[in-house]
């Protein structure tokens, strides 16, 4: 029993202990929670205190900023007030000087009048005594008294006139002061209102930002034309007062009616202006009052009568021309200015003599002509190293038979003297170790055929022409030697031009070559820049200024860069390695002038390399002009399709091609990328739309798209974002797209070389490819090229294609058809003497065809739209027709009467010539009567003719679109018509380049007609200036290159 009690008590004891522990632990937890909550409360209070302190600090900072801004505003106001006081003081001084000058001028005029009266009295007295010596003295004394009275009367008139002029000047100055005070008060109120609004907003920084534009605006307005409310009405009052004073014999205030020039173009008041702004009263004094004082000082003393007054005004007007010449484009002067035309006569002397043909040549100067030719004899070029190739022993030991067999194995053909032997491995090329490591990393195991032969030739410093099939590694064949060549020369510093220059015909090819070079140049520390149109020129210019060893470019944009800033951006003096990729297109007639001009600006001892997959003979003749003893390399045949490409040509009409394309897409869409070629931009977009409707996502690429769209399209196509691309021939050259399995020529290529490059987009770098070409019976003229391509690449020729080509060649032999061109010798004007002569000859032939007889004495400027009298040509034709009719009547009458005529001219002397014949037969009488009738009709026409006016024409059809839009817009034509008084209308029809103008049609031109010859000349000169500005803007600002036909909205 006792043990059970003990056990129970111990159990209770343990339970109590556990309860105590639980209470203590719960108390401990409560204390800890209480401490944690109190600490959180303290932290919260600390954060609130910090936030309050930050707010106080920000508030104090804002108050300091506000005080600082107010202090700055007060200081600015003090400076403004000080400036106003200084201006008022200067104005008072100028007013005093002006009054003193006027008084001196009036006193001098008075003295001269007195001297003139004294001389007149002396002459009259001398004349009186000479003829009437015997007259009594009484009348002579009376005459002297009358003369004294006249002198006193003249002096009173002069004094009255002087007082009126002084009063008018004082009133004018008072009016100006009142307006200036009103303007200053208005400006001060505006500034206070703005400052009050900014203070209410409580943003100090914005107040500082708003004060600066307001101050700049006030300064800008001060330099502009100053007009206040009521200015025009007061000016009209001044004009009436000036007219009244002119009627009274003075010319003091008559010039006040001229409006204030823009910006104060006079030099008299330039020293009195502050550097930051132009005071309106200063501008008025400099442009109005001081010139009037100069006029009064330069005027002759006696200008009492109207005739002398008029001549003096003319002298003053002519004297104003001696200032600095004004150029076209200034603010159009007011209608009341009599010297509007006279101010620019000297400026336009040259432009009037310049005919429209010379103007077109000057304005439409090509890019190649804008790049000046360098005289290499005056430049001291530094020598450089060309030959880096050392033949290894394994290659040296090869016998001639072994070399020939190896070349045959590589399908190589070489032409030239001492051609190096082809290499077998990369190590034998003579490249640096860094280049060899990069080649190994990129996975190039051994050189391809063109590389095996081109590398030793180019590394030896020889010029070469490389002709290899598409996808054969031509880019690497010239990039690797160029990198070795550049690395051997001194480093490029900012301001130097590139050492290596690569030119390509398309922008996409430039981007691709640039990306290939970047793979190697980064390891060597060489900078490479891509220069091409359609993209921002600012970044390209900045990269060139930093220095670039290699430049990859299109010729047009490169010439733009070379011409910009007079050649200060970059130059070609250091170019020692020149490459032209796709050289056959580079030397086509469209590119040849630009290429030639760039080549002429590089040093003569450079190394030049040309590569292409096709190279016709006629283009090779042009290309060899820039080469020195070149070596020609051919891989396979010349202009031959790669044998790894399976070619299929199908004769299909236009309406069956789309369904056949869908069938091909269903078969090849999942195998790889597909490229479809069409012949035009419209066809490209329409086919894109049709494929989208049939569920095929695709991309389009053509020259009408923006450059950014073209780059993103190619990037998406190469990166498998989309595997179907529809393109024009802009994608036919040089583009390397991995896994491109099928090429479809939806429209047949228009020449053989284009076909080779199109199908060469597949089957690259040893891969197999497939190409399908559609041709219809209407396109039979292109069938022989397709047969040639298939035969040269050892492909089977379909029977229907062979029959199509045979039928066309039979028609050619019969003369009913003409074989199409080679696709070379493109368009593009050269603007040289030959084209000028051809144009003139064609124009003369057309004139003869329509029965017009040109005047031998007329110059081209008269023919090409010079100013002429309206109706002058019609009157001349009427007179010529009348004379011809009279001659025919006289000749017929004379032949009927069996009379001999000795002259063919029957002009105004025709009646006298006919009347001199003594035989009064009936035929002679009829001829005489006909001549008289014609002359009477001409006299009647001239009597009822319209008033004489002048007209001219200015052709604008061939100018860029922005220039045509600007020159035909009313915002441009309106001020010119108002200024010159000539009417300008747009006539004719716009004809794109290459479109033939019809017989009864005219190209787009401006027709100018006016009441005077001078007005028409001035209007035409101003129109030419606007066109020239637009043309220069298009050529000299390559960043604004013309966009294509399409744009993405």
From Swiss-Prot:
Coiled-coil intervals: 1012-1037
Domain Helicase C-terminal, residue spans: 644-805
Designated name of the protein: DEAD-box ATP-dependent RNA helicase 42
Residues spanned by motif Q motif: 424-452
Bias (Basic residues) ranges: 118-131
Residue ranges of the motif DEAD box: 581-584
Biased composition (Basic and acidic residues): 64-106, 161-170, 181-199, 304-313
Domain called Helicase ATP-binding: residue spans: 455-633
Domain free text: The Q motif is unique to and characteristic of the DEAD box family of RNA helicases and controls ATP binding and hydrolysis.
Catalytic reaction(s) noted: ATP + H2O = ADP + phosphate + H(+)
Record GO terms (molecular function): ATP binding; ATP hydrolysis activity; RNA binding; RNA helicase activity
Species per Swiss-Prot/TrEMBL record: Oryza sativa subsp. japonica (Rice)
Keyword tags: ATP-binding, Coiled coil, Helicase, Hydrolase, Nucleotide-binding, RNA-binding
Similarity-based family: Belongs to the DEAD box helicase family. DDX46/PRP5 subfamily.
């Amino acid at each position: 029993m006792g043990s059970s009690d003990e056990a129970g008590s111990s159990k209770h004891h343990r339970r109590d202990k556990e309860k105590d522990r639980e209470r203590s632990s719960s108390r401990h937890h409560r204390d800890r929670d209480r401490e944690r909550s109190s600490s959180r409360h303290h932290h919260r209070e600390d954060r609130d205190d910090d936030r309050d302190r930050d707010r106080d600090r920000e508030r104090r900072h804002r108050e300091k900023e506000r005080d600082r801004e107010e202090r700055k505003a007060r200081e600015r106001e003090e400076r403004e007030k000080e400036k106003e006081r200084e201006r008022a003081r200067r104005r008072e001084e100028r007013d005093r000087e002006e009054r003193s000058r006027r008084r001196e001028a009036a006193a001098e005029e008075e003295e001269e009048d007195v001297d003139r009266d004294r001389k007149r009295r002396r002459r009259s007295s001398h004349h009186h005594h000479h003829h009437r010596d015997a007259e009594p003295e009484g009348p002579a004394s009376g005459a002297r008294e009358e003369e004294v009275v006249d002198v006193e009367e003249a002096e009173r008139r002069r004094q009255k006139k002087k007082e009126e002029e002084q009063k008018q000047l004082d009133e004018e100055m008072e009016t100006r002061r009142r307006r200036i005070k009103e303007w200053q008060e208005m400006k001060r109120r505006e500034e206070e209102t703005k400052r009050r609004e900014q203070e209410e907003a409580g943003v100090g920084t914005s107040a500082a930002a708003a004060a600066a534009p307001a101050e700049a605006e006030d300064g800008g307005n001060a330099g502009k034309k100053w007009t206040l409310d009521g200015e025009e009405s007061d000016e009209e009052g001044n004009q009436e007062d000036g007219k009244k004073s002119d009627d009274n014999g003075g010319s003091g205030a008559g010039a006040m009616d001229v409006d204030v020039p823009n910006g104060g173009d006079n030099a008299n008041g330039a020293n009195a202006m502050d550097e930051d702004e132009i005071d309106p009263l200063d501008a008025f004094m400099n442009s109005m009052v001081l010139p009037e004082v100069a006029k009064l000082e330069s005027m002759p003393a006696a200008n009492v009568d109207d005739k002398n007054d008029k001549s003096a005004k003319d002298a003053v007007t002519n004297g104003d021309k001696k200032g600095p010449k004004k150029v076209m484009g200034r603010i159009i002067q007011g209608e009341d200015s009599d010297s509007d035309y006279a101010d620019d006569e000297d400026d336009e002397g040259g432009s009037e003599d310049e005919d429209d043909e010379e103007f077109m040549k000057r304005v439409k100067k090509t890019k190649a002509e804008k790049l000046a030719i360098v005289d290499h004899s005056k430049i001291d070029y530094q020598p450089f190293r060309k030959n880096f190739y050392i033949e290894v022993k394994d290659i040296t030991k090869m016998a001639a038979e072994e070399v020939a067999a190896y070349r045959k194995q590589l399908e190589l053909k070489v032409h030239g003297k001492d051609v190096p032997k082809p290499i077998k491995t990369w190590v034998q090329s003579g490249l640096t170790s860094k280049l060899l490591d990069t080649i190994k990393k990129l996975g190039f195991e051994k050189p391809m055929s063109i590389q095996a032969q081109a590398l030793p030739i180019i590394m030896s410093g020889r010029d070469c022409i490389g002709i290899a099939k598409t996808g054969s590694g031509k880019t690497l064949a010239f990039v690797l030697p160029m990198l070795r060549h550049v690395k051997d020369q001194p480093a490029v510093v900012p301001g130097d031009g590139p050492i290596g220059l690569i030119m390509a015909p398309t922008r996409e090819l430039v981007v691709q070559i640039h990306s290939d070079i970047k793979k190697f140049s980064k390891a060597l520390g060489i900078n490479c820049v891509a220069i091409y149109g359609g993209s921002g020129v600012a970044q390209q210019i900045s990269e060139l200024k930093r220095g670039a060893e290699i430049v990859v470019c299109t010729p047009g944009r490169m010439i733009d860069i070379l011409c910009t800033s007079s050649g200060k951006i970059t130059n070609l003096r250091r170019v020692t390695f020149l490459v032209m990729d796709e050289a056959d297109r580079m030397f086509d007639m469209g590119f040849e002038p630009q290429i030639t001009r760039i080549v002429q600006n590089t040093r003569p001892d450079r190394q030049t390399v040309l590569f292409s997959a096709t190279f016709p003979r006629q283009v090779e003749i042009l290309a060899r002009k820039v080469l020195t003893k070149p070596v020609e390399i051919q891989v396979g045949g010349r202009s031959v399709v790669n044998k790894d490409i399976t070619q299929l040509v199908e004769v299909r009409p236009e309406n069956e091609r789309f369904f056949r394309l869908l069938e091909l897409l269903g078969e090849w869409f999942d195998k790889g990328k597909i490229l479809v070629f069409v012949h035009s931009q419209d066809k490209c977009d329409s086919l894109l739309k049709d494929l989208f409707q049939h569920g095929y996502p695709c991309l389009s690429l053509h020259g009408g798209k923006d450059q950014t769209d073209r780059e993103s399209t190619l990037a998406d196509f190469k990166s498998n974002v989309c595997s179907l691309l529809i393109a024009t021939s802009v994608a036919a050259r040089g583009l390397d797209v991995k896994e491109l399995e099928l090429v479809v020529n939806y429209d047949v290529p228009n020449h053989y070389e284009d076909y080779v490059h199109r199908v060469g987009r597949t089957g690259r770098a040893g891969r197999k490819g497939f190409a399908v070409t559609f041709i219809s019976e209407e396109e039979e003229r292109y069938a022989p090229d397709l047969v040639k391509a298939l035969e040269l690449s050892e492909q089977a020729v379909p029977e229907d294609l062979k029959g199509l080509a045979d039928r066309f060649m039979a028609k050619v032999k019969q003369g009913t058809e003409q074989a199409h061109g080679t696709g070379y010798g493109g368009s593009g004007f050269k603007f040289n003497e030959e084209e000028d002569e051809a144009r003139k000859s064609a124009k003369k032939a057309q004139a003869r065809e329509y029965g017009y007889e040109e005047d031998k004495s007329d110059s081209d400027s008269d023919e090409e739209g010079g100013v002429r009298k309206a109706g002058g040509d019609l009157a001349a034709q009427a007179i010529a027709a009348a004379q011809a009719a009279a001659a025919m009547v006289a000749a017929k009458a004379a032949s009927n009467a069996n009379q001999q005529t000795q002259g063919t001219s029957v002009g105004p002397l025709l009646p006298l010539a006919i009347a001199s014949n003594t035989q009064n037969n009936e035929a002679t009488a009829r001829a005489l009567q006909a001549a008289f009738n014609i002359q009477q009709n001409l006299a009647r026409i001239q009597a009822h003719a319209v008033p004489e006016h002048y007209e001219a024409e200015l052709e604008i059809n061939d100018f860029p679109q922005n220039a045509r839009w600007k020159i035909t817009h009313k915002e441009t034509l309106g001020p010119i018509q108002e200024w010159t008084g000539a009417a300008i209308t747009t006539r004719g029809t716009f004809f794109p380049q290459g479109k033939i103008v019809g017989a009864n049609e005219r190209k787009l031109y401006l027709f100018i007609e006016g009441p005077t010859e001078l007005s028409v000349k001035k209007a035409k000169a101003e129109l030419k200036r606007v066109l020239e500005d637009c043309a220069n803007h298009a050529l000299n600002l390559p960043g604004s290159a013309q966009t294509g036909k399409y744009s993405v909205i």
